Amino acid sequence: MKLFDVYSLLDMEPVRGEGAYLWDKNGVEYLDFYGGHAVISIGHTHPHYVAKISEQLSKIGFYSNAVINSLQVELAEKLGPLTGYPDYELFLCNSGAEANENAVKLASFTTGRARVLAMHGAFHGRTSMAVALSDNPAIQAPANKTANVTFI
């Protein structure tokens, strides 16, 4: 089996990261302006991050959100005051695409409307609804074109 060809790959294989820097398999150092889809913006191998992840993995790596998870409750309680929206409800997702798709679904449930406005040239992820909201025919399958999306 081989990997699905989603993107044209750059001829560079990072094997190590520290702070804002990456090293490839040939030892070439790069200043990393990417940050992994904005999920590692504190830098690579940050000691606090590594310690907290290691601590959690030594207890349990993952479990369903269908059971009580005090860490999720603690996160919600901390995010409220930090964001200025303490009365909001937190809905945790695995990816930006999943967050975008669920935001559209929640808006539709709330308003009863089906039509969605999306920006020309925007990219929202690779789940079905996120692709439908992305104005890029190269990634849209016929099934993605059934959504009620108007591009502005």
What are these regions (language model features)?
Residues 1-88:
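N-terminal glycine-rich, Lys/His-bearing helix-loop that initiates the first secondary-structure elements
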